[in-house]
């Protein structure tokens, strides 16, 4: 799917329509231990299944939702919107 890099849309900070630049959200730094690792560690000292899942959590979906950030050209602030499913997303210059 192709999408324009810049287009006019509403800015919730300026309360008006201005040109926005679209960028993909980069992943942040990962935290120490995730919730499932903490849960497993809690279960190690008990009788039973030691905090494991009875069924393995599901795999990946065939397409991912878009994760985009819209940056206002007027105030410079960025906001997020709900993503949609797209196989491949490219930006038009």
Curated annotation (Swiss-Prot):
Record SUPFAM superfamilies: Zn-binding ribosomal proteins (SSF57829)
Family matches, as Pfam families: Ribosomal_L44
Details of cofactor binding: Binds 1 zinc ion per subunit.
PROSITE patterns found in the cross-reference section: RIBOSOMAL_L44E
Keywords, alphabetical: Metal-binding, Ribonucleoprotein, Ribosomal protein, RNA-binding, rRNA-binding, Zinc, Zinc-finger
NCBIfam families according to UniProt: PRK05767.1
Subunit-level organization: Part of the 50S ribosomal subunit.
Family matches, as HAMAP family: Ribosomal_L44e
Name recorded for this polypeptide: Large ribosomal subunit protein eL42
Name of the gene: rpl44e
């Amino acid at each position: 799917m192709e999408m324009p890099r810049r287009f006019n849309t509403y800015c919730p900070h300026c309360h008006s329509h201005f040109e926005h630049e679209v960028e993909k959200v980069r992943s942040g730094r990962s935290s120490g231990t995730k919730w499932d690792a903490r849960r497993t560690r809690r279960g190690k000292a008990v009788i039973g299944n030691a905090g494991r899942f009875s069924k393995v959590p599901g795999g990946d979906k065939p397409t991912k939702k878009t994760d985009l950030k819209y940056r206002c050209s007027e105030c410079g602030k960025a906001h997020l919107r709900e993503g949609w499913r797209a196989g491949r997303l490219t930006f038009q210059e």
